Amino acid sequence: MSDFSPDMKNLDIDPIPVDCDLSYNTNIEVLKFTAQIIYIITGIFLNSAVLGTILWRCREVYSTNSFFTLFSVDCIANISILITEGLFARFFIYFTPICPVLADYFQSPLVGFKIIMLLTHHVSICKSLLQVLLVLNRMTCVLFPITHDSIWRKSLKYVISAVFLIPFCADWNIAISRVYMQSTYGGFWVSYFKKVSWASQSRFQLVFIIIALSFTFICTAITLLKLPERSKEIEKAISNATVIISIGFTFKVLFQIYYSFFFSYTDASSPVYGFSFLALDFLTVGSPIVMICVSRNLRTHIFKSKRKNQTLSKMLTRTSGMVIAR
């Protein structure tokens, strides 16, 4: 996100030319686009499958489980990010033949793409908050096994509302700033000129991601230490999933530090920018994959026939800690 301002009279309304970098090999860039779109679409499918299973197909199994309710909201966040930062961003960045064709149409203020940019950053913060709630949920399941369900049942609608409302405190600078298309690799993608120089969106995100990572490490450590010996095999899979997701958050923190303190408007085509996409993809595509792998019941509900699912659902216990890892 840029402090750089081109030489123009009115930054809010004057056209900003898009310079297409024609030095990139079209075939290689389109190949990058194709490879990424394949796993992005796969990620959208898997998140949608998990979401549909939890909220509709097997609602009677998961509706009383606070962890899976939170995870379904996380799937919604993943789908939103994969559509905006995945399908839209990769198309304009890597499908280079469109740059010379469309460049002239993106010189004026971009209201539609400002909404996309706002949605992307808003949902990214939501995802950090959801990570906090997910690991906190697992920890309370171990520390307060008797009252865990009632605690979360009473507070769940409030914490989910907070997940969507809190990021608004970080959206305002994009809302009042000029969004424009910046040359990125052989294509282009959105950036913005900060109206308020200190209110960097990347720094806002860094704060929330560090909080999420801290909660992840602390809550996981407490969960493992306090977990009854007889339950360790049951919860081991969940803890492994937490560690894997934590690795993704660690990489995300590193990239956010770069964007917060070292990024300049000329770096949009640097390799670091491309690698930051991969860290984001690891979280959004990897999250449902990890959960499907560690939860046999969820895996069965997603991939087995409807009749088998109905039979299995009747046999399942609805205990929060147990149903996750079976």
Curated annotation (Swiss-Prot):
GO molecular function: transmembrane signaling receptor activity
Gene Ontology terms describing biological process: sensory perception of chemical stimulus
Signal peptide location: none
Short name of any one Pfam family annotated for the protein: Srg
Bilayer topology annotation: Multi-pass membrane protein
Main location (coarse class): membrane
GO cellular component term, pick one: membrane
Keyword Mitochondrion: no
Subcellular location: Membrane
Transmembrane regions: 36-56, 67-83, 115-135, 156-176, 204-224, 243-263, 274-294
InterPro entries, A to Z: 7TM_GPCR_serpentine_rcpt_Srg, Nematode_SR-like
Family annotation (Gene3D superfamilies): Rhodopsin 7-helix transmembrane proteins
Alphabetical UniProt keywords: Membrane, Transmembrane, Transmembrane helix
SUPFAM superfamilies registered for this protein in UniProt: Family A G protein-coupled receptor-like
Family: Belongs to the nematode receptor-like protein srg family.
Name of the featured protein: Serpentine receptor class gamma-14
Organism this protein belongs to: Caenorhabditis elegans
Encoding gene, per UniProt annotation: srg-14
